[in-house]
């Protein structure tokens, strides 16, 4: 409560009898209000409570500072004297107040309580009004601040929503970017891992291939080592073979062979009923093939002993040519007819000429029956020949003889072929002149008397065809040929004669051509051999008549069947009117062949 209001209340509530006692207090406090009159003080306390409060504030402060109850009591006691002093003074505005004014006219002590109550009520009303205004202002300010706060909050919410939306958009963009980047990185990593796996697999395959190739290389090295060892062994064997061939004594071998074949075979006159049937024959064959050219072959066989009791051939005589003689004496010794042992079987078979063999072989051919020369005739077997008897044996012998005679008459003056180690020579005899055709160069014709002498020798030998030899320049070995075309005439038979052997004109110092490891003898040796063979052929021709009357026809028939079988083993292509030589070393790709 304000200080002035309290003073007034105290002043109004104090009875009147106590005014004298308190006058001293008023005097004590008179200095405090000496600057203002009482009316001004009261007026200010009624209409300007703030001023009264400001004025009373120092007093209230001083009272509180003193903290003494005595001073307060003294101050309260001096209040009624002030009120009474105010009542005695004139009004400020001078005049009656119709409305009663703020203060009514001075009243008595009994009515002063009502006035104070009114004053308090008015004071309360003014205070309430001021408080209400203050409160209203405060509420309005609060409301305005709330509105402002609400607007600011709404603005902040809008801003926050926009910011949050932008943040969300940016976060979504960042998430998408991160997802795409991670997917790309995953793809790259997967491709890298896959490439690495493929590379490792390829490396493993390459390692496997390398190991396989390494194994193959090792195997190849081992094979090469084996081949080197094999080559060394073969070279050693070749050296040993060369040493053995170098140690071979050809003259001693020839002497031993001569000693073995010089002794004639012992024949039992009691068991031998017919002379030897094997003779020196020029066997001819003829096979007509439309797609091939005729090839000439010639076989030479010497008398061989026939044992009718055993049904097989005994060792007979064959023309054996010695090997590599260095002088004429050894050649003459080797040129003598030799008796060789024949294989003890029932068949006399021809040896097939091998074109790819380095060592030349003279084919031995047997006689051919009438079925080979007469069209439509079949070769009989052994059982058929045995069943037919001795009558058919005679017809076979006649056909065989007539075939030889016709061949002799047709090819009496045929050309002779001989070969030089350097070139092939073809000698044609015609009208007393000799023409030689070679591979690289030509030779001058021989003298006419040599050709004439050859014809005389052929006539002396009863028109037996000349055996021609064809030499291979590659291996320096001759090949015998056979004149083939036949035209049989029944009832004719002439003795057989051995062929004429020719000497190579290109080798005057060493007139030797190896045949089966042997040599071709000079003229003296040829003459001796021819005389020997002529005697043998005459002996054989005298005994031919015994074939038909022999009681051992079956054995003889089997012998001829053996000859026929041997002849039929190697069929030849022939054409009448042509005489060609077959070179053992001939090849279809060789331009040097005829």
From Swiss-Prot:
GO cellular component labels: condensed nuclear chromosome
Compositionally biased intervals (Basic and acidic residues): 434-443
Disordered: region residues: 434-454
Biased composition (Basic residues): 444-454
Subcellular location: Chromosome
Residues modified as Phosphoserine: 588-589
Coiled-coil residue windows: 109-135, 165-189, 219-245
Domain of life (superkingdom): Eukaryota
Pfam families documented for this protein: IHO1
Keyword annotations: Chromosome, Coiled coil, Differentiation, DNA recombination, Meiosis, Oogenesis, Phosphoprotein, Spermatogenesis
GO biological process: DNA recombination; homologous chromosome pairing at meiosis; meiotic DNA double-strand break formation; oogenesis; regulation of homologous chromosome segregation; spermatogenesis
Self-association state and partner proteins as the record states: Part of the MCD recombinosome complex, at least composed of IHO1, REC114 and MEI4. Interacts with REC114. Interacts with MEI4. Interacts with HORMAD1. Interacts with ANKRD31.
Function: Required for DNA double-strand breaks (DSBs) formation in unsynapsed regions during meiotic recombination. Probably acts by forming a complex with MEI4 and REC114, which activates DSBs formation in unsynapsed regions, an essential step to ensure completion of synapsis. Not required for HORMAD1 functions in pairing-independent synaptonemal complex formation, ATR recruitment to unsynapsed axes, meiotic silencing of unsynapsed chromatin (MSUC) or meiotic surveillance.
Name listed for the protein in its UniProt record: Interactor of HORMAD1 protein 1
Species name: Homo sapiens
């Amino acid at each position: 409560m304000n200080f002035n209001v309290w003073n007034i209340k105290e002043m109004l509530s104090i009875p009147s009898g106590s005014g004298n006692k308190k006058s001293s207090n008023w005097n004590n406090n008179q200095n405090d209000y000496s600057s203002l009159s009482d009316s001004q003080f009261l007026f200010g306390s009624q209409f300007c409570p703030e001023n009264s409060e400001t004025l009373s504030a120092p007093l209230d402060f001083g009272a509180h500072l003193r903290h003494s109850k005595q001073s307060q009591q003294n101050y309260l006691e001096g209040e009624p004297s002030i009120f009474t002093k105010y009542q005695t003074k004139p009004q400020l505005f001078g005049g009656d107040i119709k409305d009663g004014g703020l203060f009514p006219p001075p009243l008595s002590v009994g009515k002063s309580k009502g006035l104070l109550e009114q004053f308090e009520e008015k004071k309360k009303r003014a205070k309430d009004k001021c408080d209400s205004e203050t409160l209203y202002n405060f509420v309005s300010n609060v409301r305005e601040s709330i509105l402002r706060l609400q607007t600011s909050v709404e603005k902040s919410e809008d801003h926050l929503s926009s910011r949050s939306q932008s943040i969300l958009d940016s976060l979504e963009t960042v998430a998408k970017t991160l997802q795409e980047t991670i997917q790309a990185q995953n793809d790259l990593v997967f491709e890298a891992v896959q490439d690495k796996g493929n590379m490792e697999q390829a490396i493993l395959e390459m390692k496997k291939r390398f190991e396989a190739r390494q194994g193959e290389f090792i195997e190849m090295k081992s094979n090469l080592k084996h081949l080197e060892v094999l080559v060394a062994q073969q070279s050693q064997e070749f050296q040993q073979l060369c040493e053995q061939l170098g140690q071979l004594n050809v003259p001693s071998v020839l002497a031993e062979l001569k000693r073995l074949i010089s002794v004639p075979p012992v024949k039992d006159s009691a068991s031998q009923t017919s002379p030897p049937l094997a003779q020196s024959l020029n066997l001819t064959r003829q096979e007509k093939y439309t797609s091939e050219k005729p090839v000439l072959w010639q076989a030479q066989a010497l008398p061989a002993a026939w044992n009718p009791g055993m049904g097989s051939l005994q060792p007979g005589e064959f023309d054996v040519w010695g090997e590599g003689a260095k002088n004429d004496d050894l050649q003459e010794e080797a040129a003598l007819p030799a008796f060789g042992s024949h294989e003890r079987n029932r068949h006399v078979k021809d040896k097939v000429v091998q074109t790819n063999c380095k060592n030349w072989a003279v084919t031995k051919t047997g006689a051919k029956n009438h079925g080979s020369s007469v069209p439509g005739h079949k070769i009989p077997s052994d059982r058929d020949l045995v069943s037919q008897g001795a009558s058919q044996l005679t017809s076979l012998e006649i056909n065989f003889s007539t075939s030889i005679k016709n061949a002799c008459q047709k090819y009496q003056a045929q050309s002779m072929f001989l070969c030089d180690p350097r070139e092939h020579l073809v000698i044609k005899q015609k009208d007393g002149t000799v023409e030689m055709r070679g591979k690289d160069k030509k030779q001058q014709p021989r003298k006419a008397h040599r050709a004439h002498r050859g014809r005389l020798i052929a006539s002396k030998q009863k028109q037996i065809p000349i055996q021609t030899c064809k030499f291979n320049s590659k291996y320096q070995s001759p090949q015998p040929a056979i004149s083939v075309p036949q035209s049989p005439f029944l009832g004719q038979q002439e003795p057989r004669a051995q062929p004429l052997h020719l000497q190579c004109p290109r080798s005057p110092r060493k007139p030797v051509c190896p045949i089966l490891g042997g040599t071709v003898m000079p003229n003296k040796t040829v003459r001796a051999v021819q005389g020997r063979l002529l005697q043998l052929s005459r002996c054989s021709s005298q005994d031919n008549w015994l074939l038909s009357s022999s009681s051992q026809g079956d054995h003889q028939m089997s012998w001829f069947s053996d000859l026929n079988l041997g002849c039929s083993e190697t069929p030849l292509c022939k054409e009448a009117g042509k005489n060609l030589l077959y070179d053992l070393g001939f090849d279809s790709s060789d331009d040097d062949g005829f």
